[in-house]
Every structure is written in C-alpha cells, then in structure tokens.
Amino acid sequence: MATIKVDVVSAEEQIFSGQAKFVALPGEAGELGILPGHTPLITRIRPGAVRIEAENGEEEFVFVAGGILEIQPGAVTVLADTAIRGKDLDEAKAEDARKRAEEALQNTGSNLEYATAQAELAYATAQLAAIQRLRKLRGQN
C-alpha cells in the first residue's frame, strides 16, 4: 500500500516522523482525512487529536493545541503550537485545567481576561475530548 511521509513538530520537539498510510486531524473547517496522493493544501488546525496510521499498521495519537497543516504530494507536515503524545496525556490535569478555566470565565474583569479564559477552556476541552477518543479507540471506557 502507498504511504506518505508525516512529520508532527512543535516548537519544543519533533513528536512523530515516519511513513503513514493515513492521517486524520481536526482542520479549520472540520475533520480532515489524508491519504497518499492528497491534493496539496495549507490550512489551520484546531485543538484536538491527530491520528496517524503508520506504515506497519500501528496507530499513533498526538494531541495538538492548534497550528498549521501543510500537505504536499509526498509529505504531510503538522506544525503544532503545542503537541503531546497520546500516551503522555493526563486526564486529571486536563480536567483540573478545564475547571480553572470555567471559574476564570465567571470572574473575568476585562475582555482580554475573558478571551484568555475562553482559549484555556477550549484547549482543556479539546484535550479531554482527545483522551476520551483515544480511550474509545483502544476499547477502554
């Protein structure tokens, strides 16, 4: 089966680099599925889970907090604002962050504080959704 080169990088480190059969991620206008031979594209990505079906059939999961996606004829590059390997996601920390953001929304004094709290809430909610999705795909409840 044909494959495509996939790189997922953040400002801190390279999270994944290898050949893949399929990549799915949250694009700006909805979920994107990428197979080898996909039309070239550059778009923003929303916070959420990136699922990579590697050449050997194993699945890799990465949480991204947004960023840019570039698709070229032989390569997919995800430039993430922040990226966390699926196995490193911490549900308790994400839930705590969600609660803090919700509290901050109730106690904001300025538009900037409100916007910051909204962004933090969106990030935590997306991270929790990615954890739930990963758990479901692994057959755990």
Swiss-Prot record:
Report a single Gene Ontology molecular function: proton-transporting ATP synthase activity, rotational mechanism
**Pfam families, per this entry?**
ATP-synt_DE, ATP-synt_DE_N
Protein topology in the membrane? Peripheral membrane protein
Q: Name one GO cellular component term.
A: proton-transporting ATP synthase complex
Highest taxon listed in the record's lineage: Bacteria
Report the SUPFAM superfamilies cross-referenced here: Epsilon subunit of F1F0-ATP synthase C-terminal domain (SSF46604), Epsilon subunit of F1F0-ATP synthase N-terminal domain (SSF51344)
Listed A to Z, the keywords are: ATP synthesis, Cell inner membrane, Cell membrane, CF(1), Hydrogen ion transport, Ion transport, Membrane, Transport
The principal location of this protein is: membrane
Localisation: Cell inner membrane
Its annotated function is as follows:
Produces ATP from ADP in the presence of a proton gradient across the membrane.
Family, according to the entry, reads as follows: Belongs to the ATPase epsilon chain family.
Report quaternary structure and partners: F-type ATPases have 2 components, CF(1) - the catalytic core - and CF(0) - the membrane proton channel. CF(1) has five subunits: alpha(3), beta(3), gamma(1), delta(1), epsilon(1). CF(0) has three main subunits: a, b and c.
Q: Which PANTHER family match?
A: ATP SYNTHASE DELTA/EPSILON CHAIN (PTHR13822), ATP SYNTHASE EPSILON CHAIN, CHLOROPLASTIC (PTHR13822:SF10)
Name of the protein in question: ATP synthase epsilon chain
Species = Paraburkholderia phytofirmans (strain DSM 17436 / LMG 22146 / PsJN)
